[in-house]
């Protein structure tokens, strides 16, 4: 389509009927001059020139000095026709018609003038040009438009106009031209009826002037008159189209659908209605000659739909170029803003409307998406100003419709499908091209991504998970937070390798996946990537699970699972863990939520290995890492810090989602606070494994599924472990390699401080399961050192951290008492003490059975079982099951340790067997103590938040209850203390009176001093058990800090 706007007037007016002015008198020389110039406001397309409604200005300069090159000969012809008119008359529309002569050019011209009553009067002129290049024209027909004028489509690509007994048929050269002619004629007939221009009346007398000017050749006049009899110049349909009988309704529906499709796909400027009907017949494979009237009516209806602007929203119209050129319609609809989404159409009324142009063509390669943002703001500008905006292109089908769909998607947050259906419902001819549809789909993704930034899925889901049922399964995406580089944790490469069931955990830096045979589903596989903190916490959750759940292979955490589970539920929508590891998963998931480290997740496996060697890097990369000032003191839970610089117990129990380093590692019993309140990261894991395994041997029947739900205990070194997980032979990690156990006897008896630092700081994962298993199984004869060391730990941790942990420790006890758990556990444990140990039943599936296969027969030493009595004795009572859960969870914790696990393996193996035995036994009672004191109900924890001072009132009473229940109140499993502080241990009188005699105390002090001295000796961290003596290439930063640490100790 060629749009030509000829020297548009800057002062357009809305009055369509005021085109002629009374001051213009015929014959006036000035007016004659004005009429010599062509109108400045004609809108031209191929085959039609539409007068843009001007105000008081006459049709201006009649001479077109620089005609538009792409408008064909229409501008020149229009200029000649205007010069043919009287000065007071104006052309409203000129439409080119088909001609029987190839070289002849014919126009139907609608001319209007002011009548006797200053009303608009219209006539039709038939103008002939002898050739396209002709500079002159003649009039061959004059037809007055009286009030009885009727217009009909002839079904052959034209329309008939009948009035006062005369009928003429006009066949415009294009559908677009015909549609513009029908519009103008319709309005002209309406004016004639309104003013009652009856035939033969005084109106339209001025038409006699043009009747007197008829001077065309007779052949031309005959063509104008003979057209009433002319059916069509189109030949009949080919014979191959055989008439098929069809049902009327079905055919009409099919015609409507096909016709609409054809008209939207055709360039209506270059096709006639005959051609459209031909195409329709071809597509339908039938002759539609009988239905041509129906087809024409439908075509007219579709043209009307295409031409009429569609009100999409209260402030937004979607239309075509014709709507943009109809000043009266624009002003009547309240449009003040026009968004022109075309390159070929100019702005018609730049002085009257606010325009914004998107200069693009309707092509699939056009990048329309880049303009949608500015279009959105322009449309909203109209909305803010309480006005309306017209968005138009050529037909209002593709470009402008796509822009409106994009606007709806952004403005209302709709998906593409909804926005498209809505706009198509409002404007049925809407059909964006394939390229625009692809861009709309891309735009939908952009908007979705923008919304996701504010979506709760990209934040910690504290609020939503509070309302989530505990046993309501949630997909992995429900709780996987985004890693710092934007990658969901489930998509990290080394996580995918870990998804194989039954394999040891390959994940580095305190993370691993609980991938066992009982966790085969994608939910469990993907969702169980967690941060293992202290086995004590796991034991807490296990303790709170009822016995019935313990026997099920797929147990789910119960409502009263306790403090840890409550916090987990507040952080995660994580509801379908299997077995005992269900609670573990929740605790660990909470750790992961708190402790996602930017570097920890973003690093490659080689960088992860560096993290294993460098706890400072771990701390720096972890959101949960302690401040640098606290690193040295956090080695063993800050044993000697009476008031650590952590904020509060409430802050620790309810860590912020941001995971500030200080807040996320505060000293309290929060399951998510690993560093201070919980068990020592090193000792409990050393001890938990043998305890758990001995316990499991004596209570296999009650816990048939606890083993399989936990990863295998023996893991290859960090590097090989990653390889194993991805390889087919990863199952080898399930069995303890000889190279893993043997170096434990040969390595020097030194545990580097860096390992301890790493353990207490970040790993919180059981470090040295395998060595402890190996070593613990042999020395079970000497029970005295065990009690010594246990007292040592208990008393040491009691004294210096009284203000820090007792408050938190007793806080939970108060809540336990509210829940009635302390009394129940006390009774059950007292009864447990009196129950003799059963012989070990047959081994069960899972890591525990594999583990005990590696434990020498000494592990069934009755003395050892007796020492573990309260924990390992089977019982049918619910609390017995819960008490058994503690060692099992300890076992799970130690089994699922991350790569740092191996470094401690090597150095832990350097302990004397007696020492290992004693520390293995140390946490048994304190483990139950931890479980009891920290298994407060989920509901009761809310009453504690922000009120840490309440727990001091009943400290002594609670401690007494624990001792009577056979539990020590020692802190190893509760407070994440570190062996590094053993040299400065002191005793609390309560613990001495509870479990110690003078000789025990003395021996334990000696043992502590010796162990503390060798623990202080820094040493490079080996990369795997086989290379125990190989120092790490880069010393851990904690080693560099050893002087300050030693001074503090």
UniProtKB/Swiss-Prot annotation:
Belongs to the protein-tyrosine phosphatase family. Residues 308-449 form the Tyrosine-protein phosphatase domain. Keywords: Acetylation, Actin-binding, Cell projection, Cytoplasm, Cytoskeleton, Hydrolase, Phosphoprotein, Protein phosphatase. Its EC number is 3.1.3.16, 3.1.3.48. Changing residue 937 to A: Reduces binding to YWHAB, YWHAG, YWHAQ and YWHAZ. Abolishes binding to YWHAB, YWHAG, YWHAQ and YWHAZ and increases association with F-actin. The lineage of its organism: Eukaryota, Metazoa, Chordata, Craniata, Vertebrata. Tyrosine phosphatase activity has not been demonstrated for this protein to date. The modification Phosphoserine is found at residues 37, 57, 515, 576, 897, 978. This is Protein phosphatase Slingshot homolog 1. The active site is at residue 393. Interacts with actin and this stimulates phosphatase activity. Also interacts with LIMK1 and with the 14-3-3 proteins YWHAB, YWHAG, YWHAQ, and YWHAZ. Interaction with 14-3-3 proteins inhibits phosphatase activity and also blocks recruitment to lamellipodia and stimulation by actin. It comes from Homo sapiens. GO terms for cellular component: cleavage furrow; cytoplasm; cytoskeleton; growth cone; lamellipodium; midbody; plasma membrane; synapse. One of its GO terms (molecular function) is protein tyrosine phosphatase activity.
């Amino acid at each position: 389509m060629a749009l030509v706007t000829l020297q548009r007037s800057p002062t357009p007016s809305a009055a369509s009927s005021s085109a002629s002015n009374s001051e213009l008198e015929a014959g006036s020389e000035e007016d004659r001059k004005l009429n010599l110039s062509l109108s400045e406001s004609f809108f031209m397309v191929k085959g039609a020139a539409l007068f843009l409604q001007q105000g008081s200005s006459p049709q201006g300069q009649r001479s077109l000095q620089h005609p538009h090159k792409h408008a064909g000969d229409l501008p020149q012809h229009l200029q000649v026709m205007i010069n043919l008119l009287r000065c007071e008359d104006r052309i409203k529309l000129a439409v080119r018609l088909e001609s029987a002569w190839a070289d002849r050019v014919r126009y139907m011209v609608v001319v209007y003038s002011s009548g006797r009553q200053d009303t608009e009067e219209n006539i039709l002129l038939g103008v002939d040009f002898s050739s396209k290049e002709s500079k002159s024209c003649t009039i061959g027909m004059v037809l007055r438009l009286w009030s009885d004028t009727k217009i009909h489509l002839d079904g052959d690509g034209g329309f008939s106009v009948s009035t006062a007994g005369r009928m003429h048929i006009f066949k415009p050269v294009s559908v677009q031209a015909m549609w513009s002619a029908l519009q103008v004629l319709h309005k002209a007939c309406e004016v004639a009826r309104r003013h009652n221009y009856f035939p033969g009346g005084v109106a339209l007398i001025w038409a006699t002037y043009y009747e007197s000017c008829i001077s065309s050749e007779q052949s031309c006049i005959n063509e104008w008159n003979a057209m009433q009899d002319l059916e069509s110049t189109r030949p009949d349909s080919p014979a191959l189209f055989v008439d098929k009988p069809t049902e009327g309704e079905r055919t009409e529906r099919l015609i409507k659908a096909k016709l609409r499709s054809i008209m939207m796909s055709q360039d209506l400027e270059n096709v006639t209605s005959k051609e459209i009907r031909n195409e329709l017949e071809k597509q339908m494979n039938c002759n539609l000659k009988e239905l041509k009237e129906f087809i024409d009516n439908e075509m007219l209806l579709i043209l009307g739909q295409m031409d009429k602007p569609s009100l999409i929203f209260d402030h937004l119209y979607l239309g075509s170029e014709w709507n943009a050129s109809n000043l009266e319609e624009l002003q009547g609809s309240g449009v003040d803003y026009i968004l022109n989404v075309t390159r070929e159409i100019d702005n018609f009324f730049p002085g009257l409307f606010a325009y914004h142009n998107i200069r693009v063509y309707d092509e699939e390669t056009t990048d329309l998406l880049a303009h949608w943002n500015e279009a959105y703001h322009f449309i909203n500008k109209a909305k803010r100003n309480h006005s309306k905006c017209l968005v138009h292109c050529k037909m209002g089908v593709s470009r402008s419709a796509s822009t409106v769909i994009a606007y709806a998607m952004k403005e209302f947050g709709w998906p593409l499908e909804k926005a498209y259906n809505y706009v198509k419902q409002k404007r049925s001819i809407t059909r964006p091209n394939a390229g625009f549809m692809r861009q709309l789909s891309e735009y939908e993704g952009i908007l979705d991504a923008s919304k996701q930034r504010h979506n709760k899925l990209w934040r910690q889901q504290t609020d939503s998970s509070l309302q989530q049922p505990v046993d309501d399964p949630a997909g992995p995406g429900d709780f996987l937070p985004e890693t710092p580089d934007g990658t969901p944790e489930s998509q990290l490469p080394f996580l995918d390798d870990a998804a194989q069931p039954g394999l040891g955990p390959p994940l580095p830096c305190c993370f691993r996946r609980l991938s066992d045979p009982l966790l085969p589903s994608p939910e469990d596989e993907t969702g169980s990537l967690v941060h293992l903190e202290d086995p004590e916490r796991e034991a807490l959750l296990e303790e709170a699970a009822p016995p019935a759940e313990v026997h099920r292979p797929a147990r789910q955490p119960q409502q009263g699972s306790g403090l840890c589970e409550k916090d987990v539920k507040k952080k995660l929508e994580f509801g379908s863990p299997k077995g005992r590891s269900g609670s573990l998963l929740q605790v660990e998931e909470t750790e992961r939520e708190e402790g996602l480290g930017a570097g920890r997740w973003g690093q490659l496996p080689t960088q992860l290995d560096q993290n294993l060697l460098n706890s400072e890097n771990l701390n720096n990369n972890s959101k949960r890492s302690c401040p640098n000032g606290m690193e040295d003191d956090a080695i063993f839970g800050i044993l000697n810090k009476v008031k650590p610089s952590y904020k509060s117990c409430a802050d620790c129990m309810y860590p912020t989602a941001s995971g500030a380093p200080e807040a996320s590692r505060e000293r309290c019993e929060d399951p998510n606070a690993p560093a201070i309140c919980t068990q020592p990261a090193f000792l409990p894991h050393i001890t938990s494994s043998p305890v758990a395994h001995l316990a499991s041997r004596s209570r296999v029947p009650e816990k048939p599924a606890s083993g399989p739900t936990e990863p295998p205990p023996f893991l290859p070194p960090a590097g090989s472990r990653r390889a194993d997980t991805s390889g087919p032979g990863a199952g080898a990690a399930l069995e303890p390699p000889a190279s893993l156990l043997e170096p434990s006897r040969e390595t020097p008896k030194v545990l580097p401080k860096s390992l301890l630092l790493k353990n207490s700081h970040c790993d919180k994962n059981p470090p040295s399961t395998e060595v402890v298993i190996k070593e613990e199984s042999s020395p079970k004869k000497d029970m005295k050192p065990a009690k010594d060391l246990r007292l040592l730990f208990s008393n040491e941790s009691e004294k210096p951290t009284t203000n820090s942990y007792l408050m938190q420790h007793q806080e939970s006890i108060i809540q336990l008492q509210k829940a009635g758990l302390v009394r129940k556990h006390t009774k059950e444990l007292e009864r447990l003490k009196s129950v003799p140990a059963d012989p070990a039943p047959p081994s069960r599936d899972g890591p525990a059975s594999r583990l005990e296969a590696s434990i020498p027969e000494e592990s069934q030493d009755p003395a050892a079982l007796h020492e573990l009595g309260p924990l390992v004795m089977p019982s049918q009572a619910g609390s017995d099951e819960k008490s058994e859960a503690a060692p099992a969870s300890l076992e799970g914790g130690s089994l699922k340790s991350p790569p740092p696990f191996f470094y401690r393996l090597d150095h832990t193996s350097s302990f004397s067997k007696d020492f290992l035995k004693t520390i293995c036994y140390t946490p048994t009672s304190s483990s139950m103590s931890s479980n009891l004191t920290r298994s407060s109900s989920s509901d009761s924890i809310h009453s504690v938040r922000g009120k840490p001072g309440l727990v001091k009132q009943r400290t002594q009473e609670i401690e007494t209850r624990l001792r009577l229940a056979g539990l020590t109140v020692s802190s190893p499993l509760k407070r994440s203390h570190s062996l590094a502080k053993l040299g400065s241990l002191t005793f609390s009188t309560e613990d001495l009176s509870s479990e110690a005699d003078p000789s025990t105390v003395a021996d334990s002090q000696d043992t502590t001093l010796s162990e503390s001295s060798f623990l202080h000796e820094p040493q490079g961290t080996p990369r795997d058990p086989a290379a125990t003596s190989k120092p790490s290439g880069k010393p851990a930063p904690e080693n560099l800090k050893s002087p300050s640490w030693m001074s503090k100790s």
